[in-house]
């Protein structure tokens, strides 16, 4: 399975300890860009772009890494996010996944037709230490999401996830290369 990348917006603000060495800030600095400026990208509509023959430019069934140069839940994207959700819903043949540190905002910005979650959207929450795991994971588990991922990256300290692991977690990954999966 191929993984396509879709960055509907770019830029972020350092949010917690895990952001100290953010790759987006490092990469943007090489090109003298300000990574703290959040802006809508020219590729915003990539999932629904069509070729001359009318077919979608992005072919399914691809996984689509979404918003890896920003945070999908960043405040500045509130005006654009409803259209991003609409495109995800339209492209049920693609599987979108995004990772966020701002999980506290998720319930407030879900689309009205979200229900138990779109079947083609996976959401991951980043927990870089025990404090962030204990703060973010209960919020994450309280919101309806069909496929949940816990990402311990960058893993700044040891993290005990046992209190948060349940049938609702599809996968856990850590930046040391270890991965746990709930099943197929």
Where is each model-derived feature located?
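Histidine/lysine/aspartate-rich catalytic loop segments that bind and position anionic ligands
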Residues: 125-129, 133, 138-178, 182-184
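Conserved Radical SAM active-site core
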Residues: 1-16, 20-121, 130, 159-170, ...
